[in-house]
Amino acid sequence: MLNNVKCLVYGYGNPGRQDDGLGVELALRIENDEHLSKYVDVDYNYQLNIEDALTISEYDLVIFADAALNIDKSYELNKIQPAHTITFTTHELSAESILALCQDLYNKKPECYMLAIRGYEWEMGLPMTSRAKCNLDDAYTFLTEFIENQFSRCIAGKGI
C-alpha cells in the first residue's frame, strides 16, 4: 500500500497450457519484484471465481492480467466497467462480471483494468512460446511504469 491506495494485480490462466499462463506469470513477476511487491498485492488462479468479488472489494486499484489471442499488439490495457453477463459455466466468468458482483454485493467499485497479453499457442504440457515470453517482458515493463504512475498521481492528489 502506498499513500493509502491498495493495489492488486490478479493474474489468471493455466500455466500448463503454454501461453494461457501469461497472466499468472506476470503476477509471479510482480510478486518477486522487490520494489513493487512492497506496494502491490498479488493473486493468481487458473480462472476467475465468484469469490474474487470479495477479494477485489478490498482494493482501490485492480489490474487483471490474462492471455489473449485476438489482439494485434504484444499487450493491451483497457479500463473495464461492471457488466452482468450470464455464462453457462463459471469457467467463462469475466473480470467485468467480477466487478459487477463486487459492486452489487459489497457496494464497492475499485478502478479496474484488464491487461491482455498476446499469446499464440494453448497446447497442454508444452512450455510458453518464445514470442509470448517477449510479450510478457513488454507487458511487465509497461505495468511497472503504469503502477508507479498511478501512485504518483495519488501522491499529487489527482486520485487514481
Question: What are the roles of these predicted feature ranges?
Answer:
Residues 1-119, 126-138, 143-160:
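N-terminal catalytic or cofactor-binding beta/alpha core of small enzyme domains
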